[in-house]
């Protein structure tokens, strides 16, 4: 669901706030609606500032002239836009220190009990065991997003009562990884039909 607020930055603007950076901003005097969806733990101030400082000053009351060249350029850019993968190397000799070893976790908001990693040529398979005993695997690709579906609930930064009530899976996850140093591997998971992302 969304909360509805008066939106600072422009008189008469109204915004609907969803969790983790879901915004619907109505700028009534410009007959304009801006929709943003992202997975951020911030308050969205920087993103909204782009609307006020960059987008809004370019808005005019008269229709834009047809510009086929710019429209074709926009289409070309849209065709290649993608979520950037984690940057780094595909492998590290240090991986043998973690290969197939169980990492016990302390209490955490995700309900995860332990993690285990298996390293392939250009893939990391993360096995998650929840405190309930439920286990599932998340694949992470190198220079690509590996996707899978899962029946487990995705991580959520807030814990309202019954936050998943009435919601059914599967939830789709896209994972990317890279070794950012000899001893550090970074995993990034985006829950593509949910509102959260996770970096480890």
Each language-model region and where it sits:
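Surface-exposed amphipathic alpha-helical segments
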Residues: 49-63
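Active-site Gly/Thr loop motif
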Residues: 1-36
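Peripheral terminal and inter-domain segments
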Residues: 68-200
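N-terminal, helix-rich and Lys/Arg-enriched segments in bacterial and organellar proteins
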Residues: 34, 63-64
């Amino acid at each position: 669901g969304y909360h509805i607020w008066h939106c600072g930055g422009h008189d008469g603007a109204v915004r609907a706030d969803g969790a983790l950076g879901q915004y619907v901003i109505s700028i009534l005097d410009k007959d304009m609606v801006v929709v943003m969806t992202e997975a951020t733990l911030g308050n969205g101030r920087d993103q909204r500032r782009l609307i006020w400082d960059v987008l809004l000053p370019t808005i005019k009351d008269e229709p834009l002239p047809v510009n086929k060249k710019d429209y074709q350029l926009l289409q070309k850019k849209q065709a290649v836009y993608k979520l950037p993968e984690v940057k780094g190397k595909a492998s590290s000799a240090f991986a043998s220190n973690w290969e197939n070893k169980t990492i016990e976790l302390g209490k955490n908001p995700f309900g995860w009990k332990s993690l285990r990693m298996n390293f392939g040529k250009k893939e990391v398979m993360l096995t998650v065991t929840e405190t309930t005993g439920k286990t599932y695997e998340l694949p992470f690709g190198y220079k690509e997003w590996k996707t899978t579906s899962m029946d487990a609930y995705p991580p959520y930064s807030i814990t309202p009562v019954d936050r998943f009530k009435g919601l059914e899976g599967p939830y789709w996850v896209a994972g990317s990884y890279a070794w950012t140093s000899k001893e550090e591997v970074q995993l990034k998971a985006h829950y593509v039909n949910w509102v959260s992302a996770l970096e480890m």
